[in-house]
């Protein structure tokens, strides 16, 4: 794969954020590229890394033909982890998903693990290992994207994955999913740190306007979230920046070493919260001994602009408003947010009629890192008590 070499970067304490890199060519061999402004990641290295990377697919009541396309597009070497929060009654959409996955396995013999987010075996496992952050007042796993991601990460850790990548199940272009996974691998191969995150910036998000396709560059929520993340950085460096372009990147990946030391927020705030947390915790040289290896190696965040456009399911205006509120809430409640930044966020949310005059954004609910969870014990409890766990080739 040929990519623009990362030239400009923003350094915030131990965190390095690389400027967005465009994919120039999807597939290359080992020949050297005699140009310093281009990075060459040979296909052999990418394919070697894919076997060490689990792809997590959180889903909830998605169209089955979209799910089918996404699964078929994930490179064969990658273990697939499906965490579904779909209906199990009236109608039982989860059963339909299981049937689809069984058929997919029979055709491909891909490595797949599948589980339902509300499986009582999961709740029991979390309770017994003392990780109650993910449970609601009734002792069940909460419904939320962040919760599904944590379940996926633990399953990935249980099978020994060194890298994890997330892809959404509502993608209309299966070929783009194949690219996303290879983009993740390219990002990891460019990194010099064991603590690395790769976030994707879609080249375009096409919309149907007046009967034709309009290839829009930015999503509505992304544009606003990125603006405030950049302000958060700028107010502490005293230099204006536009470095962050992936604040709401649902398609992102990280090394397991990074994933297991990070707390995660619930719902749609999860992706911007990842950035906010890294800036808060590793943006200053404080309490270094707790994470000495992390501070020594540094954290690298790569942003890669995809070759493919991104078509996904339109979930309506209310969904957009909720995403915007929860995304900006993470920045508003950050320890790094200044009073002037908070005021700008409040004005923006009120202008969009998302908050009333005297309201504040809700404080995000944050779940502890998974590092201290005894993974073998957790997995054994899940296997012994699960109603929905399926394992193929794993």
UniProtKB/Swiss-Prot annotation:
The keyword Cytoplasm applies. The keyword Cytoplasm applies. Pathway: Carbohydrate biosynthesis; 2-(alpha-D-mannosyl)-D-glycerate biosynthesis; 2-(alpha-D-mannosyl)-D-glycerate from GDP-alpha-D-mannose (MPG route): step 1/2. It comes from the Archaea. It is an enzyme of class 2 (transferase). One of its GO terms (molecular function) is mannosyl-3-phosphoglycerate synthase activity. One of its GO terms (cellular component) is cytoplasm. One of its GO terms (biological process) is mannosylglycerate biosynthetic process. It catalyses: (2R)-3-phosphoglycerate + GDP-alpha-D-mannose = 2-O-(alpha-D-mannosyl)-3-phosphoglycerate + GDP + H(+). Its EC number is 2.4.1.217. Keywords: Cytoplasm, Glycosyltransferase, Transferase. SUPFAM superfamilies: Nucleotide-diphospho-sugar transferases. Belongs to the glycosyltransferase 2 family. NCBIfam families: osmo_MPGsynth (TIGR02460). Transfers a mannosyl group from GDP-mannose to phosphoglycerate to form mannosyl-3-phosphoglycerate (MPG). This is Mannosyl-3-phosphoglycerate synthase.
